[in-house]
Swiss-Prot record:
Gene3D superfamilies found in the cross-reference section: Vaccinia Virus protein VP39
InterPro entries: rRNA_ssu_MeTfrase_G, SAM-dependent_MTases_sf
Subcellular localization(s) per the UniProt record: Cytoplasm
Gene that this polypeptide is encoded by: rsmG
The protein, known as: Ribosomal RNA small subunit methyltransferase G
Organism: Psychrobacter cryohalolentis (strain ATCC BAA-1226 / DSM 17306 / VKM B-2378 / K5)
Length: 238
């Protein structure tokens, strides 16, 4: 690492954005680099996020890596890779999400729920997972970031009774499985939004009930070369 990069540890400047390193534990000397990568991705995705929101995203990443061993949150331990594959990957869906209350099923470490809550403070977000330790982490990081719009709940989806306008998930390999467990919790005129790698096959889509209409959105995730798609499903009368 160059001396100039080391010297910039005291502040990460992204145009007019200043990231104070106070409170960061794991990102350390990489904070300026990570801040610049994040700022560039936000610009490429057409998002408008304040300096505080950008700081919150980086603090979330810092906490994710700090508590990873204790809570078994992610297999990715490199900060740059985690920023791209977790934070920026989730940022890519923000502009495509319908409005309204949101439930994230199988949220794990809070992805995409925490990212959405940071970016859209006006939206009520619920993070649902049966893993108590991961929900404990989300409660902790939500408190530290002041996310009053975030409600972490430790429960299986089958035992959860509320309904939501938007239901998201990164956790399901099968689109059919996601629809099956999410549909009972979907509000009238609501939307299911599944984050996927490859676009679903014709066989997968044909297996859905004829009651559903769908839209496949190809996502361009900055610095990520893997395929990413958002599958939006709604009832045909929506």
């Amino acid at each position: 690492m160059s001396d100039s990069t080391k010297a910039s540890l005291s502040s990460a400047n992204m145009g007019n954005i200043h990231i104070d390193p106070t409170g960061f534990v794991k990102l350390g000397a990489q904070l300026p680099t990570l801040a610049n990568i994040l700022a560039q991705a936000i610009d490429e995705l057409g998002l408008t996020l304040s300096a505080q929101q950008q700081r919150s995203l980086l603090l979330y990443l810092d906490q994710l890596l700090l508590w990873n061993k204790a809570y078994n949150l992610t297999a990715i331990t490199d900060p740059v890779e985690a920023l791209i594959k977790h934070v920026i990957d989730c940022l890519a869906i923000i502009t495509h999400l319908p409005s309204g209350s949101l439930l994230d099923i199988g949220t794990g470490a809070g992805l995409p729920a925490v990212i959405i809550a940071i970016c859209q403070p006006e939206r009520s977000c619920t993070a649902l997972d049966s893993n108590q330790k991961k929900i404990r982490f989300i409660k902790q990081v939500s408190s530290e970031l002041g996310l009053s719009n975030m409600q972490p709940i430790a429960s299986r989806i089958e035992a959860h009774e509320a309904s939501y306008d938007v239901i998201t998930s990164r956790a399901f390999a099968s689109l059919i499985d996601f629809v099956a467990v999410a549909e009972p919790r979907l509000a009238d005129n609501g939307y299911l939004c599944a984050m996927k790698g490859k676009a679903p096959s014709e066989e997968e889509l044909d297996a859905l009930s004829n009651d559903w209409q769908f839209k496949t959105i190809k996502l361009n995730v900055p610095r990520l070369h893997d395929s990413r798609h958002l599958i939006e499903l709604s009832y045909k009368n929506v």
